[in-house]
Amino acid sequence: MYIEKIDSPKDLKSLSIEQLNVVAEEVRSGVLNRVSNHGGHVGPNLGFTEATVALHYVFNAPEDKIVFDISHQSYPHKMLTGRAKGFLDVNDMDAISGYSSPLENPEYDNFEIGHTSTSVALASGLQKARDIMGGKENV
């Protein structure tokens, strides 16, 4: 399994498109495993799996900031940022929250968010801060 060897999005950079498709399949399986055994949100996570793999392949998180519209889309992101075990191993599922959380991973989770409609304001704030600080990262 590829997903067990992914500690950060940088690990995706060397994979082929075919291998990235396998990663997406493994992520979807991990989401279903977690939700079946622990509860959580299925649709938003499954629906955004390929997009999350693509975002992490193209951009350079954590330098580039990725903001999700709803935290219910964050399971694939969590799996690609070193937290796959919380989706694959039933004994580790309590270690992962159902939402993005800087307490869980301050490097990749910029905000503690839950529901929708905060993403535009959060991304705008990150952009403004980047511009004030003279940064070059993508938001």
Where are the model-predicted features located?
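A short, mixed-charge helix-start or loop-turn motif at secondary-structure junctions
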Residues: 13, 37, 107-108
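Asp/Glu-centered strand-loop micro-motifs enriched in Gly/Pro and often flanked by an aromatic residue
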Residues: 33-42
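Cofactor-binding active-site loop characterized by glycine-rich and histidine/acidic residues
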Residues: 41-139
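Cofactor-/ligand-binding subdomain signature composed of acidic, glycine-rich
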Residues: 1-34
